[in-house]
Amino acid sequence: MKRHTEELDALYELCSREKMELTESQYELLAAYALLLEQWNKKINLISRKEDAPVVIKHVFHSLLMGLFHPFSAGEKVLDLGTGGGLPGIPLAIAWPETRFLLVDSTGKKIAACQAMIKELGISNAVALHSRVEELKGLTFDTVLSRQVAQLEQLCAYTYRFLKPEGCLICLKGGNLEEEIRTALDARHAHHGFPSTIEHFAISGFSPFFAEKEIVIAQR
């Protein structure tokens, strides 16, 4: 119970500072998810087991920051590609209950953990699916999310076929991204002109734990 309260207090302080409009029940669910993620991580490798920051900051708040740069809307269809332990999809589904999230990963054990957490938390706007990206056919989305370490050009190659016109790919990435962005833009002729533009935003100011971290938005 003490751990839950500590997670809740840390998250409330960060989110309220950024004027994120979350209800008490949403804070409760986000803190509960952080604890579930840690519990599941002891059984399955979902996140690093040598964390240098609290999970609620490094993973939950980190995911929520996407919504500051891309306000999710009611009815928006979002694909979380390579979700792992439900990141960023589960925190975002809690914070934006009218947006629909499909969480996909090629590792069955990780998806089983996501399905169990979604069920325990009572989240109705998120579905976890065991699938490879190549097997997703006939589906289109307004937005694709990724926390994968894959190069941006590779992520664009994976996702352009799923994006609706005016859709975007949002990535949480780290390091010097100039060359990675230039490579993705140079290769857009191979991906039906995607991305048309790429914006990137440093997020180190939100927390010392996000040094050299950025949010990248590639527009269809």
Swiss-Prot record:
It is found in: Cytoplasm. Keywords: Cytoplasm, Methyltransferase, rRNA processing, S-adenosyl-L-methionine, Transferase. GO terms for molecular function: rRNA (guanine-N7-)-methyltransferase activity. The keyword Membrane does not apply. Pfam families: GidB (PF02527). Gene3D superfamilies: Vaccinia Virus protein VP39. Its EC number is 2.1.1.-. S-adenosyl-L-methionine binds at residues 82, 87, 105-107, 133-134, 147. The keyword Cytoplasm applies. GO terms for cellular component: cytosol. Belongs to the methyltransferase superfamily. RNA methyltransferase RsmG family. Specifically methylates the N7 position of a guanine in 16S rRNA. This is Ribosomal RNA small subunit methyltransferase G.
